[in-house]
């Protein structure tokens, strides 16, 4: 420290007077000494001392965090060990009981009768068989036909790789250029004019669950079930047919029920389109009614043409002041098949909304296949299953194989009997996006292709944004709230896309052109498989 001597405290300085004013003169011994080197050294020591204190504090925090993690691991280990110990004790007690009990000699097996020996036992109860196109062989499926078929295309990667068309190529290129994208989906095949199996699984799973309810309770039924109930109720009301009492009866003769509904929908003049009219708080927040209510706003369904048709037929009559109120056919069917927990759709409008959207998917599917003609061979066909599957693909010997001209709705009838019914029988809760992922993709692409006759090339990646967001949330961020928001946004886009297709002057031509330009479809056979698979793979020589 520096010494500051203040001599003026001990001895008064002489005063100098000039013109009657007193001035104090400094004492020559009042001197402040400052050493530059000492000041720098002190500053350096202070900085080192501060750094040392920060390091000590950081080490203490790290030690506390490590102690916390170790304590948590120890508690988890103790918990798991106790569970294992308990299970071992249970097994030990069971073994002791078996050892104490008398051993019974096995009796010789009884000879089987000829009829019993000729009937093979099927142990795979979770396996079912579907057929997509007339004349094609059936496919044995465990849970997801499109995923299992796509997985079988990557067995000869040294010779050829599957390619899925312009839409999937653009999606793959943009995905590989994104800064934030799951590392496990960045396969080497994505850079070889193909799409990796993991990325295809992620995309197809996202598309297939676009209309799935990610939260529900006992009052909900799937959108597919809602659509089937409404279509059957409309058919029973119009034809006086008996009300179905089993789920299988909902699927019986679906082509006739849907065909009559499409015919009446074409001739119906009510409704302004195929869009809902939500209020501001209903627009983008959630599919569910606002404020935890069971109904939407008063004019929510007023502009939708399907709702207008159902209301005009008397199926959705909710007038409580009627002298002789009509029987609620929809509620009768849901109560009979799905139980008494399902409320009437007029009061619980979630099921009504998702059912109407699912009917739109069925209508587009029916329109695309209404006049389809499936030929045995076609020079311009994209999908060649015999090339993709090799010797496993053998043509069927059904009677439809040699048929030249198919009647109106006959191809959809075949698809219903051989694909829709087996799939829904195996799992009654699948959404329509799972049944028809191709229609979901057409709906999404219709928003990016507002006018297919204009020579515009869409170079933006915004059309894949919602799909990428869901994939990122599932694989990387894993935030439930953000995942729910992304799924809701994708579901709204599907709704808007379906409306965009059905309001077109020619929905069939509009949708078929999207399949041709974006996915490579050329004929009705390609369209049929695209509706079911959501893609049209071809064999591409490996680079």
Swiss-Prot record:
GO terms for cellular component: host cell; host cell nucleus; viral capsid. It is found in: Virion; Host nucleus. Residues 1-54 are annotated as: Interaction with major capsid protein/MCP. Heterodimerizes with CVC1. Interacts with major capsid protein/MCP and triplex capsid protein 1/TRX1 at the pentamer vertices. Interacts with the large tegument protein/LTP. This is Capsid vertex component 2. Belongs to the herpesviridae CVC2 protein family. Capsid vertex-specific component that plays a role during viral DNA encapsidation, assuring correct genome cleavage and presumably stabilizing capsids that contain full-length viral genomes. Participates in the interaction between the capsid and the tegument through interaction with the large tegument protein/LTP. Residues 101-120 are annotated as: Disordered. GO terms for biological process: symbiont entry into host cell; viral genome packaging; viral penetration into host nucleus. The keyword ATP-binding does not apply. Keywords: Capsid protein, Host nucleus, Host-virus interaction, Viral genome packaging, Viral penetration into host nucleus, Viral release from host cell, Virion, Virus entry into host cell. It comes from Saimiriine herpesvirus 2 (strain 11) (SaHV-2). The keyword Transport does not apply. Pfam families: Herpes_UL25.
């Amino acid at each position: 420290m520096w010494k500051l001597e203040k001599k003026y405290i001990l001895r008064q300085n002489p005063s100098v007077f000039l013109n009657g004013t007193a001035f104090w003169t400094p004492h020559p011994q009042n001197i402040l000494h400052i050493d530059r080197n000492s000041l720098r050294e002190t500053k350096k020591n202070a900085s080192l001392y501060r750094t040392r204190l920060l390091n000590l504090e950081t080490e203490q925090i790290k030690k506390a965090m490590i102690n916390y993690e170790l304590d948590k691991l120890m508690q988890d280990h103790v918990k798991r060990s106790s569970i294992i110990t308990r299970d071992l004790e249970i097994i030990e007690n069971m073994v002791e009981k078996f050892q104490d009990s008398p051993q019974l000699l096995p009796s010789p097996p009884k000879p089987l009768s000829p009829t019993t020996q000729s009937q093979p036992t099927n142990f795979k109860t979770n396996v079912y068989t579907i057929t997509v196109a007339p004349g094609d062989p059936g496919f044995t499926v465990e849970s997801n036909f499109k995923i299992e078929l796509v997985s079988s295309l990557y067995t000869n990667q040294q010779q050829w790789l599957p390619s899925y068309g312009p839409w999937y190529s653009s999606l793959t290129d943009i995905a590989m250029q994104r800064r934030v994208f799951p590392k496990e989906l960045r396969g080497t095949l994505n850079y070889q004019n193909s799409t990796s199996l993991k990325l295809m699984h992620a995309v197809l799973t996202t598309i297939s669950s676009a209309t799935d309810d990610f939260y529900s309770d006992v009052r909900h039924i799937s959108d597919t079930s809602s659509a089937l109930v409404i279509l059957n109720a409309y058919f029973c009301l119009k034809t006086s047919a008996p009300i179905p009492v089993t789920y299988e009866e909902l699927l019986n003769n679906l082509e006739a029920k849907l065909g009559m509904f499409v015919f009446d929908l074409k001739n119906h003049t009510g409704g302004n389109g195929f869009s809902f009219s939500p209020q501001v708080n209903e627009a983008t927040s959630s599919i569910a009614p606002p404020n935890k209510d069971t109904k939407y706003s008063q004019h929510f369904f007023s502009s939708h043409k399907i709702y207008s048709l159902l209301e005009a037929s008397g199926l959705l009559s909710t007038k409580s002041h009627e002298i002789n109120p009509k029987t609620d056919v929809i509620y009768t069917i849901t109560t009979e098949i799905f139980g008494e927990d399902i409320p009437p759709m007029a009061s619980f409008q979630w099921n009504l909304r998702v059912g109407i959207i699912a009917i739109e998917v069925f209508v587009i599917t029916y329109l695309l296949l209404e006049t389809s003609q499936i030929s045995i061979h076609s020079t311009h066909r994209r999908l060649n299953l015999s090339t993709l599957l090799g010797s496993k693909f053998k043509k069927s010997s059904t009677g439809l194989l040699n048929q030249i001209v198919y009647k109106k709705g006959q191809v959809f009838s075949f698809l219903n009997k051989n694909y829709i019914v087996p799939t829904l029988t195996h799992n009654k809760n699948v959404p329509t996006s799972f049944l028809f992922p191709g229609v979901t993709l057409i709906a999404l692409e219709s928003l990016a292709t507002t006018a297919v006759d204009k020579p515009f090339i869409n170079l933006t990646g915004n059309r894949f944004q919602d799909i990428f967001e869901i994939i990122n949330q599932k694989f990387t961020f894993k935030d439930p709230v953000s995942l729910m928001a992304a799924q809701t946004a994708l579901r709204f886009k599907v709704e808007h896309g379906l409306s965009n297709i059905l309001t077109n002057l020619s929905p069939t031509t509009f949708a078929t052109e999207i399949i041709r330009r974006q996915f490579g479809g050329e004929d009705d056979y390609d369209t049929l498989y695209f509706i079911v698979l959501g893609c049209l793979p071809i064999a591409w020589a490996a680079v």
